[in-house]
């Protein structure tokens, strides 16, 4: 088991893929750096999920994996895995594929406001969420929201300010409080599921 700090890179695009990973605790995102310098989130890895699947083929990692929270990760040698273990990996990757397909639909449907509402509700069911005396919040930056909603930070900041003015959310440093879940669900239009 290895611990990674928030924002720490687990592997980089182009590195030789010798290790298949399983997330034990925390939240990881798989990202791609675009030619224009923007980072886009391709997939969220939840506890129990496998990632770095390029190791199953013995290829280089195609994307970069980064911890969004403090994360505990188990490294596995796919060559040492038995048939049943590989079958578990395949089932998990199939579940993740369904999430990725839903995530693609999320990015391609609705205005930015709806995409942000969906993403905040999605994060409420991940290790990025917590509760304090003010209510449920997610620990996320405007930049991370932009990366996950095919947007830019400035546009995200404007939408968050509108949602805050309307009483749907409150914000603090790297925290977004979800004050009115029903209204956020109406804004979202459809759910982006974590499981």
Swiss-Prot record:
Q: One Pfam family of this protein, by short name?
A: HTH_Crp_2
Question: SUPFAM superfamilies annotated for this entry?
Answer: cAMP-binding domain-like, Winged helix' DNA-binding domain
Q: Which residues form the signal peptide?
A: none
GO molecular function annotations of the record? DNA binding; DNA-binding transcription factor activity
Effect of disrupting the coding gene: No production of carotenoids in dark or light conditions. Does not activate expression of TT_P0044, TT_P0049 or TT_P0070 in dark or light conditions.
Listed A to Z, the keywords are: DNA-binding, Plasmid, Transcription, Transcription regulation
The answer on whether this UniProt entry bears the keyword Nucleotide-binding reads no
Q: Which residues form the HTH crp-type domain?
A: 110-182
Identify one Gene Ontology CC term for this UniProt entry.
cytosol
Coiled-coil residue windows? none
Gene Ontology biological process terms, A to Z: cellular response to light stimulus; positive regulation of carotenoid biosynthetic process
Is Transcription one of the keywords UniProt gives this record? yes
Q: Which residues bind DNA?
A: 142-161
Function of the protein: Activates transcription. Positively regulates PcrtB promoter upstream of the crtB operon in a cAMP-independent manner. Regulated genes include genes encoding DNA photolyase, phytoene synthase and cytochrome P450 monooxygenase, which are involved in carotenoid biosynthesis. Positively regulates the light-inducible gene cluster in the megaplasmid in a cAMP-independent manner.
Q: What is this protein called?
A: Transcriptional regulator LdrP
Species this protein is from: Thermus thermophilus (strain ATCC BAA-163 / DSM 7039 / HB27)
């Amino acid at each position: 088991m290895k611990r990674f700090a928030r924002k720490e890179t687990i592997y980089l695009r182009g590195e030789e893929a010798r290790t298949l990973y399983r997330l034990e605790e925390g939240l990881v995102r798989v990202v791609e750096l675009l030619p224009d310098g923007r980072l886009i989130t391709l997939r969220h890895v939840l506890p129990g999920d496998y990632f770095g699947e390029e190791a199953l083929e013995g290829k280089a990692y195609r994307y970069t994996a980064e911890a969004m929270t403090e994360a505990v990760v188990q490294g596995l040698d796919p060559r040492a895995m038995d048939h049943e273990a590989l079958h578990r990996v395949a089932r998990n990757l199939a579940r993740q594929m369904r999430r990725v397909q839903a995530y693609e639909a999320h990015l391609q449907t609705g205005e930015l406001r709806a995409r942000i509402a969906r993403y905040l509700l999605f994060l409420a069911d991940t290790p990025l969420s917590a509760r304090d005396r003010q209510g449920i919040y997610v620990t996320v930056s405007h930049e991370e929201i932009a990366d996950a909603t095919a947007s830019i930070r400035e546009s995200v900041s404007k939408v968050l300010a509108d949602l805050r003015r309307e009483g749907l959310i409150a914000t603090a440093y790297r925290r977004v409080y979800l004050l009115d879940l029903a209204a956020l669900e109406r804004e979202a239009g459809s759910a982006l599921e974590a499981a």
